[in-house]
Every structure is written in C-alpha cells, then in structure tokens.
C-alpha cells in the first residue's frame, strides 16, 4: 500500500488507528515528490527536513493523548502566495523569489 495513493479520509483513518504514522505518510509523499519533481516542477519551495520534523511532532501529539483536530497528521501544501514565517513567499514571480515574511497569513495559522 502506498499512502500517497490514499484519499485524505483514508489517510486520516489509518493514522488514527495507528496503521500508519504521520512520518510514514510524509516519507511516502517525499518519495513521490522526489520521483516526479524534476519533470513536474510543482514546488516553488520544498523543505524535506521540516516536513519530517512536523510529521514527527504530529505523531508525538497524537501519542500523547491530547485532543486532535479532524485533519491532524494530514500533509498539506501551501501555495507561495500566502505569507509564511518559515518558508519563502515568492508570489509565483521571480521578482519576489526568496522573499521572507515576519508574519503568517491567516490561512496558514
């Protein structure tokens, strides 16, 4: 079973049942991105290390017994038109390439 082929609901269910960890899901998506990114060029910025760290944090949170949101552990992508504190926000143009923000867009929080 390849997690990147599952629907969001299937991923969430498998993570909640501990059939998959968030790190398992992240590694599956990383494998897929690395396989096709050179041809597809879908990512303006991709930080594999941060992705894996956040997946580990999601797993730790889940295992701690703390309350979870309905999408907890599900990977998301943030289009580079939204300001983020820890990623460049290029607005899809070379003029803004590498630009960093000191605050985050509301949709990112």
Predicted regions and their residues:
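An N-terminal boundary/leader segment
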Residues: 1-53
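Short clusters of hydrophobic/aromatic residues that line enzyme substrate/ligand-binding pockets
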Residues: 3, 40-43, 58, 87, ...
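Flexible, acidic active-site loops/lids enriched in D/E/S/T/G that coordinate Mg2+ and/or position polar
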Residues: 48-72, 78, 97, 101
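Residues within well-ordered alpha-helices
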Residues: 10-11, 106-108
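Enzymes and membrane/adaptor proteins characterized by extended Gly/Ser/Thr/Asp/Glu-rich
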Residues: 38, 70-107
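Hydrophobic alpha-helix position signal
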Residues: 14-15, 33, 61, 82, ...
């Amino acid at each position: 079973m390849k997690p990147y082929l599952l629907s969001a609901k299937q991923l969430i269910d498998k993570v909640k049942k501990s059939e998959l960890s968030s790190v398992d899901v992240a590694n599956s998506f990383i494998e897929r991105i690395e396989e096709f990114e050179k041809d597809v060029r879908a990512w303006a910025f991709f930080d594999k290390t941060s992705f894996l760290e956040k997946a580990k944090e999601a797993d730790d949170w889940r295992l701690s017994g703390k309350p979870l949101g309905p999408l907890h552990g599900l990977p998301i992508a943030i289009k580079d038109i939204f300001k983020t504190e820890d990623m460049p926000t290029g607005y899809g143009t070379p003029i803004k390439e590498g630009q960093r923000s000191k605050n985050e867009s509301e949709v990112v929080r």
